[in-house]
Regions:
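C-terminal extensions
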Residues: 1-157
């Protein structure tokens, strides 16, 4: 687990439970494929986390305005926004997130609309054909993602 308690009272490197909200605080630099120039342009506008990005660019008009102000392409910004949105789902991670993107699942609400069994099968077949990951996600993992997606608020339109 990436979140460790290193406080004296925590007893050393004890893994902490991660909640779905932790993805909100993911630094922009941890999202896949963020060029340094784009990260620095967003930092000028005080956007350094996924939560800040989703708050500032959750709808098309806001994305267009931020892209113009930060002098980045709307395509780059859209890609970061959808990756920040999916990062809210615990367990998706970079590789499985890219696999979901390839299957056209770009937002949390897209994931919520999926049938877990069908999505699991699609992910398995996709991974067998391109070997994007060492392993395909399990049915239990996919079911957990879809359940989380149902419980998360819609932040991207």
């Amino acid at each position: 687990m990436p979140y460790l308690d290193t406080s004296a009272s925590g007893g050393g490197n004890t893994p902490l439970r991660r909640t779905p909200r932790d993805g909100y605080n993911l630094p922009i630099s941890k999202l896949y494929g963020v060029p340094t120039r784009v990260r620095l342009a967003l930092k000028v506008h005080k956007i350094t986390t996924g939560a800040q990005l989703l708050a500032a660019a959750g709808n098309p008009a806001a994305r267009q305005l931020l892209a113009e102000r930060a002098r980045i392409t709307s395509t780059q910004l859209e890609l970061l926004v959808v990756r920040a949105d999916l990062a809210r789902v615990h367990g998706v991670g970079v590789v499985f997130g890219l696999m979901l993107e390839e299957l056209g699942i770009l937002k949390v609400q897209d994931l919520a609309a999926c049938d877990p069994h069908e999505l699991h099968d699609r992910l398995r077949r996709y991974n067998e054909s391109v070997r994007a990951a060492r392993r395909s996600p399990t049915l239990d993992e996919v079911q957990a993602w879809v359940a989380q997606a149902h419980s998360l608020p819609i932040l991207v339109t």
